[in-house]
Amino acid sequence: MLKYAWQSGPKQSNRWLWHLSNQIWKRSYSSKIRNIGILAHIDAGKTTTTERMLFYAGKTRALGEVHRGNTVTDYLTQERERGITICSSAVTFSWNDHRINLLDTPGHIDFTMEVEQSLYAVDGVVVVLDGTAGVEAQTVTVWSQADKHKLPRLIFVNKMDRPDADFEKCVSDLKDKLETQPVCLQYPVKNEDGVLAINDVITLERLSWQQKDLGRSYRNVKLEPSDDLRLLQEKRNELIDQLSGLDDELADVVISTESFDNVDNALIERALRRATTQQKVVPVLLGSAYKNVGIQRLMDAVNAYLPAPEERNQIYDCFGTEVAGKVFKIVHDKQRGPLTLVRILRGEIKRGMRLISARGQAEVVSKLYEPLADEYREVSAVQSGDVVICAGLKSTVTGDLLTSSQSALKNAQKRYKQSLGNTAAKVEEDDELDESDELFAIDPQIPDAVYFCSIEPPSVSSQTAMEQALKQLQREDPSLRVSYDSVTGQTVLGGMGELHMDIIKSRILSEYKIDVDLGPLQIAYKETIEAPALTTLSVEKEIAGSKQSVSITLEVVKNQAELFSLDKSPDNLPNLNTLRPRILQVLRKGSISALERGPRVGGQVVETQIRLHNATIGRGTADSFVMATAAQCVQKLLSTSGTRLLEPIMALQIVAPSERISGIMADLSRRRALINDVLPKGERNKMILVNAPLAELSGYSSALRTISSGTASMTMQPCGFSSMNSVDESLAERRAQGLE
């Protein structure tokens, strides 16, 4: 016994030391990782910025150019043909002893869902602004998405080589339109030939890039006493003053020092990092990606100011040492099959590992790859904080949370609720979904479709292949809706816009070799009830020798909160208390399913609540029969109450020369548009802010080009739904029936 104890002591000690050193190594490894997203309005230069990062990091040997169609991150045929990003892509590269996992995201409003899913995988973002345009419509959208995920940000003001670039206007836009606190770390300067250089606020240096070697090298020279240096010193003092009001460590040094000139650069950078990761400020840098200026300093700022994985996502500590990974993208490779991009939030994923999704689907990881857009390098294991591509996952969908076992998931949910102080043992069946559902990816939020259309294969023999293609595309893109219309017998697609639907058709042809036919695009109208209604439906049938019996009383009322509730009045409560939770769930599911298709144009019924008054279910009645009866009862109620149509409204920003504004506004008035404001935009242009019905905007881009002789530009995005008058409702119904 003594001999055993003497022998086991050193072994246990060695094992403990190994575990400790392993944990220290993992923390050190994680501290050198940066998971970042690149966000921007379309055409701000986001993909060009990404391509320059890859080039200067040594990941690519040649500069990728959007106009040449040879970019790494825009690898789809449609992306290279159109010069826009359609799908998010992940690339990994090293920069100054750090590993950067970068996600290049789409800038077009039709692909907002791609951005949303990508933000679950990153710890910080770089927002690219067009220096000639400032904050634009989609900039505001992606900024609000980053706000939702509480992500620290850097700003890169691109295209500062252009004569019409205005850095001060961009900074002003950040304050006014995004209501943020920008801190400028750089200022632009141009020589006599108009070549862009950068003055660095912290180091008081001028940075000049060498174009002979494609911007690989740059000179940093201390400024000599001059007006430029005095101005830069003032900016440095302002930066120190601003940061000292936000950071105690810097404030203590400022109080004890005689001059701001004595404040060490490293101290400023540490204070700036703390303020950035705490989202108190947003550092602003500048350059020109196309002209190879400023990119290396941008990557330095990513390492210096954006957080490491260990500084984020503490909410996933509830998983302990178990695996927690968020699926943010799925792509289909012809040789490897479906490839799943996962951000590892906790634990370690190894080749051959068994994983389970929060929806209960078991999977086995056959291979692991390091991402480089559409190229892959195989690895055996990946640590927490990193991004990895998993092969072999057949049922996982975008947005899923993966962990090591069902018990690990349940324990994590329990710990999470305990951390919130939520120890309630029972939640009423008609309560809203648990607030942890989004965290654990049980109920991902998917935006409503704006357009829909039918899709037909070229022949009956291609039907199965088309359905398989749509199934794969839907796994990649959750915002693509696929349904079957039992009335017409057609497959129906729902999407976020005309471009979205066009890209889906193009991808089915190029990737699956099926020349599908899309029907005319239809507006995705919604419906809402005109008046409350109450009815009772009793149904009895004999199916396969078994008696099926349901009697149910439901009511529909105007309500924007819960979809389904119980009418707990004294008359109904005794009956409701006899209904088992499972039956209540079946009744809820059947009732809500009927709201997916309204009686007028088949639009989703919104702003409507279903109230269950009472229900009597015969012994042995199948759940499917109960569900169908509930749906039938709601359909009857909708016909009784009547519905009104709600049409989608788009928010437009139109920029045009002042002399073209009157013609544009006259055309907008004919399109039932509501002009919100007309603002000056530079010296010669004006910007019109307007809301208009989507139904009136078919072909509007071409019309705007004609009216303005090609001098106007436009962006638009969904901004809600609005009621219609009876004339427009009748016209919408005729369009839905194919009569217009």
UniProtKB/Swiss-Prot annotation:
Residues 31-310 form the tr-type G domain. GTP binds at residues 40-47, 104-108, 158-161. Keywords: GTP-binding, Mitochondrion, Nucleotide-binding, Protein biosynthesis, Transit peptide. The keyword Protein biosynthesis applies. Disulfide bonds: none annotated. Transmembrane segments: none annotated. One of its GO terms (biological process) is mitochondrial translation. GO terms for cellular component: mitochondrion. Coiled coil: none annotated. Residues 1-29 form a transit peptide. One of its GO terms (molecular function) is GTPase activity. It is found in: Mitochondrion. The keyword Metal-binding does not apply. Belongs to the TRAFAC class translation factor GTPase superfamily. Classic translation factor GTPase family. EF-G/EF-2 subfamily. Mitochondrial GTPase that mediates the disassembly of ribosomes from messenger RNA at the termination of mitochondrial protein biosynthesis. Not involved in the GTP-dependent ribosomal translocation step during translation elongation. HAMAP family: mEF_G_2. This is Ribosome-releasing factor 2, mitochondrial. It comes from Drosophila melanogaster (Fruit fly). The gene is mRRF2.
